[in-house]
Structures are given as C-alpha cells and as structure tokens.
C-alpha cells in the first residue's frame, strides 16, 4: 500500500480549510485517512503561526516508513526544517515564446524606422537652411 502525506479539504464553499493527513494514495482526496498530523488554513495571513500546524514527530515517523509527501506538504515540511526539497531547474521557463520574439522584432524595426525618419527630418531642415544662405551669398555677389 502506497502511503502519502497530503491535504484533505474541508470548510465551506470559497472558505477552504485543509487537514494534513496520512492516507492511502488510492483513496479519494477527502475520503478515509490513516492519521491526521496537522492542518492548513489558507485564509489566515502568511505570518500567522496557526496557518500551518504540523505534528513533526508523526511526520518524521511516516517519512521514515516511506510515506511520500505531496508538493504542497513537502513545502510545509521544508519550511519546518524536517525535509529538504529539491531545487527545481527549468531554464526554459523565462525564455520568450515565438510570438513574443516576433513582437520584439517588430518593435525594434519600428524603433529603427522612427529613428531613421527623425534623423532624415533633422537633416532636411539643415539642408534647407544652407540653401538660402547660398542663395543669399550668390545674390550679394550679383549686386
């Protein structure tokens, strides 16, 4: 029989309350369990001492006989210093997707076009200013 340390939901609709239980992994989430070793109330603030309550002696016993904690319970046990969670490595998580890359390229192209247009607009008045000065110089030579 595979035994797991997991959460069993209780409480009213939209007001969850969880018991941390030892249960057969094949039994339903809120079904029968072997032993209750704690509770978790997500409604309480994160710094509240009653948010997560775990009987560490019983948890240590069940871990020693091979019970497997779920991810959330493993997080609680790690915070209590009873279990060392493995660090997960997902280097591709932060890599942008194809559409995001396309949008970034389009933005870069628009920025380059805008910079080029601004540069051309800045050069055009400068060229026009030089032209009247040349005309004035040629007009003064004629006079």
UniProtKB/Swiss-Prot annotation:
GO terms for molecular function: structural constituent of ribosome. GO terms for cellular component: cytoplasm; small ribosomal subunit. Residues 96-110 have a biased composition (Basic and acidic residues). The keyword Signal does not apply. InterPro entries: Ribosomal_bS16, Ribosomal_bS16_CS, Ribosomal_bS16_dom_sf. GO terms for biological process: translation. It comes from the Bacteria. Residues 111-143 have a biased composition (Low complexity). SUPFAM superfamilies: Ribosomal protein S16. Keywords: Ribonucleoprotein, Ribosomal protein. Residues 85-143 are annotated as: Disordered. Gene3D superfamilies: 3.30.1320.10. PANTHER family: 30S RIBOSOMAL PROTEIN S16, SMALL RIBOSOMAL SUBUNIT PROTEIN BS16M. Belongs to the bacterial ribosomal protein bS16 family. This is Small ribosomal subunit protein bS16. It comes from Zymomonas mobilis subsp. mobilis (strain ATCC 31821 / ZM4 / CP4).
């Amino acid at each position: 029989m595979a035994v797991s340390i997991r959460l069993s939901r209780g409480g009213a609709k939209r007001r969850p309350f969880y018991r941390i239980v030892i249960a057969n992994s094949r039994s339903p989430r809120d079904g029968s369990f072997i032993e209750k070793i704690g509770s978790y109330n997500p409604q309480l603030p994160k710094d509240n001492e009653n948010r997560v309550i775990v009987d560490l002696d019983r948890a240590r016993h069940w871990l020693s006989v091979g019970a497997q904690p779920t991810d959330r319970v493993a997080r609680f046990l790690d915070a209590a210093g009873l279990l060392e969670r493995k660090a997960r490595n997902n280097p591709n998580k932060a890599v942008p997707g194809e559409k995001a890359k396309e949008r970034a390229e389009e933005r870069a192209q628009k920025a380059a076009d805008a910079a080029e247009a601004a540069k051309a607009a800045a050069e055009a008045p400068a060229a026009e200013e030089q032209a009247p000065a040349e005309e004035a110089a040629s007009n003064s030579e004629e006079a």
